[in-house]
Every structure is written in structure tokens, then in C-alpha cells.
Amino acid sequence: MQLNPKVSALFVYNSYCMIRTIMEKEGENFRMIEVKGLLFDLDGVIVDTAKYHYLAWKELADMRNIPFTAEDNERLKGVSRMKSLEIILEIGGVKLSEGEKEQCCRIKNDIYLQYIKKLKEEEVLPGVKKFLADARERGYKIALGSASKNAVEILSRLKLMEAFDAIIDGTKVKKAKPDPEVFLLGAKELELDREACIVFEDARAGIEAAHNGGMKAVGIGTKDHLSNAEACIPGLYYMTIDELLKELKASKIQS
């Protein structure tokens, strides 16, 4: 029996609407999204400058007679310079005026800049250059999303500026992670929907920022420390972009 063409067309249209509704149903991981953009944090993902931040903050803390350990430094990952200072002051039970805080931030940054002047291209973390090159060859857009105000200086020293289509750093954002501002701006500069972007982060606050912005996150580190990430790898050397997207299949992301 041959169906009336109008009936057939209506059936096809209704079926399409039903499938589209199911796949776009929010909150139940049904939405199938094509990944087009990759957003990377800087410290701990591209290069390990955390040690230099720690040494600079340690010097500042010593000036104020505030005990500050490497364990305390873990609390500063992924947050702004001012927020980091406030955490240190809280540890020491020290209160300062806004002007004094600004001065402390400048002193810390001056110390830090002296350290990163010694930064060498060889300090790029293992697998980073190949991962970025492969991603670009595959047609992905790439952005940096970092709280650091020294991101351009660091990338220049590492000869990685040309690896990124957009750089969002501490000079462009007002809100610290876990606020999603840095990643939302990254997606905007790449001219992509936020759902089409994956974030690479080494800090819980950064992963929360990705989630707050409606993006999936890949943790760089251990699953114990980054249990809130959709996937977790020890470094960008560990998987190719294709292998990683397969790992994220459970999150309904398609490449």
C-alpha cells in the first residue's frame, strides 16, 4: 500500500521533531554534541609554573611572618592573584587594607616575573606540543583560559603563542574560577557554542568553572583529586584527541 505523499511528509517531520526533542532534552545527557573547541588552562596543563608561584607566594608570606606550605599552595590553584593573597592572609590571621593587598599582589608578581624570566621552551609539559598540533590538524579551535595575567609572557617564552586561536587571561576577566567567565569568553572568541567546547584543567575550581559554564571537563592529574571531571588523565601525552573523545563517550560527546 502506498502512502499519501502528504501523510508521508507529515510522518517524517513528526519523527524528526520527536528525535530532536529527545536529543536536546536537558539534564539527562541525551544531547549529542559535536566537539569543535578545546579550552586549556595554563598552569599545570601546558606548563608547570605552579612551583614558581609557590616560591613567590612563599617569599611574600615570609615577609609577613605567615606560615605557608606546599600543601597550602594547593588551595591557590586556579584562582586569581587577589583571591590567592586573601587565602594566605586568612591562613596567617592577617588583615590588610585594600591598598596594602594591592601592594602585596604587585610584590608577589614582581618576584614571580623574576622566576619566569628563566623559563625555557623545554619546560612545556610532555605531550603538549603534539596534542595541540594534532588538534589543530584535525580542525579544532583552540583557546587558553587562565587566571594568570602573565599568560602571554609565558606562552611567548615557551614559543606557543601560535598554537592558540584565542587567549583569555587575567587581564580580560574580572571573576575568578569557579566562575565560568574565562571559559565562556574563550568559547565566545572562538565563535562556538559553549556546549561544543571541552575544558582541560588541573584544578577542582577550574573543573567547576567548566561545569558552571555548561562545558565538559578533562582533569589533568589524579581521579582522587579531580573526581568532578568527566575524564581524568595524567597529562596530554597520555592519549590522542581521538582516544580522549572515546573516553568521553559516556558523556554523550561526539567528535
Stretches found by the model and what they are:
Residues 3:
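Cationic, low-complexity basic patches in intrinsically disordered or flexible, solvent-exposed regions
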Residues 7-12, 24:
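Acidic, Ala/Val/Gly-enriched low-complexity intrinsically disordered segments
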Residues 13, 19, 27-36, 133-134, ...:
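Asp-based, Mg2+/Mn2+-dependent phosphohydrolase catalytic module
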Residues 30-73:
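Active-site neighborhood of HAD-like aspartate-dependent phosphohydrolases
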Residues 46, 124, 144, 199-200:
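Conserved SAM-binding loop
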Residues 78-115, 134:
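A metal-dependent, Asp-based hydrolase signature
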Residues 114-144:
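Short, acidic loop-to-helix structural element flanking the phosphoryl-transfer center
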